[in-house]
Amino acid sequence: MQGLSTDGGLFVPEEIPKMTLQEIEKLIDMDYPNRTAKTLQKFLTDYTEMELGESAELAYNWFDSPSKVPLSILVKNPKNSKSPICIMELWHGPTSAFKDMALQILPRLMSLALKKVGETKEILILVATSGDSA
């Protein structure tokens, strides 16, 4: 495993997986961990559905809201729209920062990746704030 690509940049998918309208509509009724697992399945094809589901469930168990990512309605009936305008509350994780959304599942996925390639060493993930979350 390596953190940066050989050219010094970040790893990005060669192509972005497509989702049908039906697949997207199915996500609506799912809780956040299941929605996360279903979405990640499109990108992380070397993980099983069970691995992604368990990783997401464990990652987001620590959030202090039952819905994990509540929506707050800002405008109930905006002009020219059938849907309210909402904002996602991304501060319900263990550190109260939006970074919890990604950084709670990342170590679980990295540990699984190491096991899949037969690596027995432990990993350490060091995370620092960029200063945008006072």
Model-predicted regions and their roles:
Residues M1-A134:
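PLP-dependent amino-acid enzyme catalytic core
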